Amino acid sequence: MKYVNLGRSGLKVSRLCLGCMSYGEPEQLPQPWSLDEKASRPLIRQALEAGINFFDTANIYSGGSSEEITGKALREMARRDEIVVATKTFFPWRNSPNTGFLSRKAIFQSIDDSLMRLGMDYVDLFQIHRFDHSTPVEETMEALHDLVKAGKVRYIGASSMEAWRFAKMQHTAERNGWTRFITMQPQYNLLYREEEREMLPLCEDQGIGVIPWSPMARGRLTRDWSVTSRRTQNDAFALKMYENAALLDKPVIDIVASIAEKHAVPRAHVAIAWLLSKSVITAPIIGATKPEHLSTAISALDFSLSDAEIIELEAQYLPHPVDGIIPPLPDTPPSLTPPSAIQNC
């Protein structure tokens, strides 16, 4: 396994991050495709044995059971000082006005709840899952800084939002001498490259580690367009995002298939190699519900694309509507939070 620094920090992470969104009790909406604890543990062990030391989850995944399953497995299988555990906060998952978004109260409660579920006394990377329009940026950034100073959080990161909002949050922290974000977790893959316009150049300039979610476009990049799975049939976000863009995306998938066939490798190799050809990318967040998913992703680290193949892959891309970054309206009751909003990575 290869290891790199996470952004401009001294923290070393594996070139792949295991995304634990799919690990959780299936009856806990909104992820009915999730694997229960018994099915999840072998995959976490497989990741550890392959040298993956970076694990990402969130308080919202499967009603918190993702953190419980992930935390328990890591406590029993790994040394705490050898792994990097990341979680996220923003989306409300209880019917209460202060259990979501990014107020000081919500952030403090969220980290305590996450640490309890993980069974740990700190997390390495605490990320805001989305931008909160209802809370002053200063309140959010100072609260995150205070968590670092309290020892509950080692580093902070952010996820899908407009680049200018991310820059504003960073500037607010720098101006006040508070902890700055070291990572950005955007949606980025061969079928959705809108982040190349502003967010990725900003991250490269500022030394922000980019850990993209949905690197396989919810599996679309790994199979023929007509092939479906339980996930594609139940994932509201994927249905909205990719089914509506079939005419734009199918030519890209065809090129992925062609290059994979030429090299006699799985299509996932092409998707991962393309991501890792970008200097701004630190570690794609890989979801795995089968052992072969994980072994394929790991072996992709030894595969690379030629410059001509990268050009060929990118030439078919057409602009997409921006998606995955707009949170629910701040006055939306938590119980009415759209399921599609919390099925993102």
Located regions from the model:
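Terminal-tail/helix-coil boundary detector
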Residues: 1-2, 41, 205, 229-262, ...
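Generic structural signal for well-ordered alpha-helices
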Residues: 44, 67, 71, 111-115, ...
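Short, well-ordered coil/turn segments that N-cap beta-strands
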Residues: 11-16, 51-53, 79-83, 120-124, ...
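Conserved, mostly hydrophobic/aromatic
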Residues: 6, 18, 40, 55, ...
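Glycine/proline-rich, positively charged
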Residues: 26-27, 94-194, 198
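Active-site-proximal loop/turn and secondary-structure-junction residues that shape catalytic pockets
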Residues: 22, 89-91, 129-132, 160-162, ...
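Aromatic-lined glycan-binding groove of carbohydrate-active enzymes
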Residues: 194-231, 266
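N-terminal binding-site loop/beta-alpha segment at the start of enzyme catalytic domains
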Residues: 1-83, 149
